[in-house]
Amino acid sequence: MSSSGLDEIDLNSLRDPAGIFELIEVVGNGTYGQVYKGRHVKTAQLAAIKIMNINEDEEDEIKLEINMLKKHSHHRNVATYYGAFIKKLPSSTGKHDQLWLVMEFCGSGSITDLVKNTKGGSLKEEWIAYICREILRGLYHLHQSKVIHRDIKGQNVLLTDSAEVKLVDFGVSAQLDKTVGRRNTFIGTPYWMAPEVIACDESPEATYDSRSDLWSLGITALEMAEGHPPLCDMHPMRALFLIPRNPPPKLKRNKKWTKKFETFIETVLVKDYHQRPYTGALLRHPFIKEQPHEQTIRHSIKEHIDRNRRVKKDDADYEYSGSEDDEPSPNNRGPSMGIRDDSESSSMIPMDNTLRKGFQKLQESSRGFAEPGAQQLRRLPQQPAPAPFQYQQSRYVEPRRESSEVKLRAVSSRGAADGPRHSPASRPRPVSHHQRSPQQSHPAAPHLADLANYEKRRRSEREERRERERQAHHAMPIARVSASVPAPQQSRKMSEPLLITHVKPEDLDVLASELSKMGGHHNGRSREESMSPPPPAPPPREASISSITDTIDVGELDNGADAEWDDLKDIMMNGEGTLRGPNKPLPPTPTDGENTLVSDVRRNGNGNSGHGAYKGKKIPEIRPGIISLDDDDSDSDNEEGNEPLMFKPINASSSRGALPDLLPKSPQLRRQINDQTRQMSDDRADESASLFGSFYQPNGFQNSDSRSSIQHSFSNRDREKSFVGYFGGGAGAGGGTVNRPGRPQDINQVQVNVTPNSNGTPAENDAPEIRKYKKKFSGEILCAALWGVNLLIGTDSGLMLLDRSGQGKVYPLISRRRFDQMTVLEGQNILATISGRKRRIRVYYLSWLRQKILRTEGAGSANTTEKRNGWVNVGDLQGAIHFKIVRYERIKFLVVGLESSIEIYAWAPKPYHKFMSFKSFGSLSHVPLIVDLTVEDNARLKVLYGSTGGFHAIDLDSAAVYDIYTPAQSGQTTTPHCIVVLPNSNGMQLLLCYDNEGVYVNTYGRMTKNVVLQWGEMPSSVAYISTGQIMGWGNKAIEIRSVDTGHLDGVFMHKKAQKLKFLCERNDKVFFSSAKGGGSCQIYFMTLNKPGLTNW
């Protein structure tokens, strides 16, 4: 279509659909938007309504689709176009308005649905002939108008209630240039795509014409005959590579097909499109022309559909709710359990050029528009003058996306003065996902209403509160929190903490967001202002402020980068007594560093402030009178300074502001609080003094700040649970030393504390710390993976989750199934595992696991997912030994080692949302015990694997298998531990660890360093850590070495021999477990305190 023709379509002149059409439910996804079942308000006639967000980048494409529908939808085999509307959204500047395309509704679904609902996944031959004929008639109409559909497939061929066939989705249609008559753009869905269309992406000179639709018709006929298109088990990018290179597909002989059907398939599936007939010629083919009476076929199809019509919600498998975003990089990932639903697109329009180019480059080295998350539509009761529909965002929406929360106007003098946001005279707008009704649809409405009435309760209880304050004046002091308010407001007193009990977890993110908006105008206040403690007040009744944070749903976290895991900020009381909150949903409370509590104590309100630090572990339960809010520094340990109501590592020299008086003022009462905190801390984690005796580093030295006084301040209990460390200057050459740079070296020993430090010393230990979770597991712990801040644990009898964000509770998730290995991909909403008796590669949806946790807590619906499968197997693999997920740019490869082969899968984004086969290598001479994948010079893929005979490589281009290192011991088997692809080596340099040694080689087997890494003893586990170090767990010690040089950075000496197993790591946090002894296992984690880690 010419640009002048597009200019004739003025989107802004279209009418608003309010009062004309109403939405009923989501029925599918088009190229540029979701498709809804709708109803004409006056006539009740059903219609299909495609809703698209308008933006400048795709405005021309949308106009093109409208033009195509207007001109070419007047045919019996093309869905009729009724009209277009513009939905004006609240507060919209026009950039985010919605376009509604209203079309004929086809109530019997797509051809793909028909195939799925047919026994055996194969339609009758006469049905296939009828459907192919109707498709050809529709295509003939389009081709006569010089239009190529370019996305013919089962999902884009719909059936009406009377079994009429209609073509839909003109989003990728193209009008041919009247002179050339050919296109050279790359678009369509991979498995149905014609070879000449794929060639256009590889060669600018390649072209195609309308006959590319006939290849797609042939693939659709195979889909109807066999249940799926050819190569559908392959990754779509792999299919794009193979379609032009493989011979044309044919009908399989497992079913008796007529000769004319076979010749029809052979006629349309000709690779050279110049030899392919045109549409008019195919309409005269015997398979198309010689058919039974049309009414007979339509009647039989209709009867079949009516007989097999099922309620999708009851019988559907668990729908994938993942993300098209990349997994955050290991050094920049936000520990998040948030899950986002992405709608499934039905085609791969210019799908991920970067991704496609990356695959193409990898496979040949030797020779869009982001749709919103899937939304569930919920009808609201009739309201005066609104549109009769509402969007409801999916349950698994990331907190940072919840920008359309209800605006709460508190019933107070301040709120009354502000006035309503919109005047009553303003024109009412239909309710949408940008504007919700708190009275009817908001899940946190009761809690928000409680906040709104809080001022009234405060006034009525003022006298009672004053009396209680006088009575409590002589009782034990309570740790109080004061808001940072201007001087005129400092005389106001904070009333009792807001009591919120039995809050549903799914409501808490919304509630936290509302609290933040109530207090948003205070966030810009300088943190350097001192905060004077208010007079004592009685303890809260049943709950405290902590009930907001302690019960927060650990699943509603963001999948983004570290910025989404900022500190817990500014929970305070304003002068009117209103509880105020952060500017984003509250994160889980524990710190991965496990947790340094810091307070800057202001003494009795005078100008002199004393600095005191309390170093300890997460307090598992907030007792009345103690307000404890922890900062999660799991991914960012470099933040220093004092912020209101945050406990975090702090530099002693930092004096950016003062903290409230969080600790009692008298020494005696402060000791009581410290003892109470210590006792509660022991309920979650114990220091491992019984297991680890000393920590050494070569050529030890002492920090410049004197630590000798620390030793004398320890209690006997503290001293017993400390260990000794030596800091070595020689380790600096290894590049992986734990020593902080710039400190003088000394041979004196220093005391390293792993216990709560109550005497005000800053928590800046250079040596690693080890903590032990008190929970004992009866089964053998085989693997673990971090999911957000929490830990998924696989044992020989099930899967469970250790809630590190709360009180250390363990949630059982799956029982009676062995889990040997696991990896979490939060961006894809999956947990990949080797599990079960047959050792399958099984992928679990994190959102499904999250629902199990919510049901355990009584917060989730009991019927939410019980009838859905929350997992899927990868291929038909059995007997998996080891797998590795490797990221290359935006591609995620899954490499699986089996008993005699190695399989490679790649993650396919929407609409597939699964790992799909990429390549396979069978009949290996060595059993792969560990596997890995490297990309040499950003171009060549190589599989690396270790066996009892050494280490080997497979070149993906040539499929050549060769040895890269074979240990010298003849006749002896080796135990491979790990393969490390060294950083900054273009995927060429390796560290291969086996037995008690490690060697440096390149991917071609040549030694690169005349160095052999030598462990002090045979390790049971070896792992590469993100700090640039490699760790070995032996029976007598844990060694930490530089991965670049193999130099020893430090070693933990055990007090008694014990076998340990590495589980997982993130940044400088390392988790490992003890072997099953005495009937139970325990989990330890180590914080390496790597210098400069925050810059990694």
Curated annotation (Swiss-Prot):
Keywords carried by this UniProt record: ATP-binding, Kinase, Nucleotide-binding, Serine/threonine-protein kinase, Transducer, Transferase
UniProt keyword Nucleotide-binding, yes or no: yes
Domain Protein kinase: 21-288
Keyword Glycosyltransferase: no
Compositionally biased residues, Low complexity: 380-393
Region of interest: Disordered: 293-351, 380-492, 517-545, 574-664
EC number assigned by the record: 2.7.11.1
Family label: Belongs to the protein kinase superfamily. STE Ser/Thr protein kinase family. STE20 subfamily.
Protein name: Serine/threonine-protein kinase mig-15
Organism: Caenorhabditis elegans
Gene name, Swiss-Prot/TrEMBL: mig-15
